[in-house]
A protein has these predicted regions:
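Residue-level detector of alpha-helix initiation sites
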Residues: 90, 154-156, 179
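Ferredoxin-type iron-sulfur electron-transfer modules and their immediate structural context
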Residues: 1-147
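Short acidic, glycine/serine/threonine-rich loops at helix termini
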Residues: 122, 162-163, 184-186
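N-terminal Rossmann-like FAD-binding beta1-loop-alpha1 element of flavoenzymes
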Residues: 147-173
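Fold-independent oxyanion-binding glycine-rich loops
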Residues: 121, 153, 176-177
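Glycine-rich FAD pyrophosphate-binding loop
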Residues: 169-185
Length: 186
């Protein structure tokens, strides 16, 4: 872990919301721009717990490798942090925004202090991935010859389709509505 005393030295600071009067006029992000210096500081608050509950069944439902990408953000190794994030999360650019951040509720630091700003860090990592073109199509090296049908194109259906495609299967996604996305669209 990067800064072993970061949790003692720094208080939690999250990105503030944009003013409501601005937000009602557009569909842009509700938070202000990320402050990269603050993000590194916030990532340094991760304590390298013996048992990181943030990424266990008590915390993140997709088992994100939270302490690992916190450390990489602290070290300013953003692309590696992005690679860790997408190992466990098919859509971090979406889940980082809609997730209720149970990982923060499970953060051990939260027992005595405010928890690490995990949700903000996840959003910042995925935003950097979008800005720098790190999201890439990754077709499988070999096809299995098997075909799979996925019913429903919401986050779960699209995640399943992506994982099955990585495994080499030919995947067809079926959706009853006029466009894909499920709850992300309607």
């Amino acid at each position: 872990m990067g800064k072993t005393t970061g949790f003692k030295e720094f208080k939690r600071v999250v990105e503030p919301y944009r003013p409501a009067k601005e937000r009602v006029l557009d569909f842009k992000e509700i938070y202000t721009e990320h402050d990269e210096n603050n993000l590194g500081t916030q990532a340094s608050r991760c304590m390298d717990c013996g048992v990181p509950f943030c990424q266990s069944n008590e915390g993140c439902p997709v088992y994100n490798l939270i302490p690992e990408w916190n450390d990489l953000v602290y070290q300013n190794r953003w692309e590696e942090a992005f690679e860790r994030l997408i190992k466990t999360n098919n859509f971090p650019e979406i889940t980082g925004r809609v997730c209720p951040a149970v990982c923060e509720g499970a953060c051990v630091l939260g027992i005595t202090e405010t928890p690490v700003a995990i949700k903000n860090l996840e959003c910042a990592i995925s935003d950097k991935g979008l800005e720098n073109g790190w999201f890439k199509a990754t077709p499988p090296k070999n096809r299995s010859g098997k075909k799979v049908a996925i019913i429903g194109s919401g986050p779960a259906g699209l995640s399943a389709a992506q994982e099955l495609n990585y495994a080499g299967h030919t995947v067809s996604v079926y959706e009853r509505d006029d466009r894909i996305g499920g709850l992300m669209m309607y």
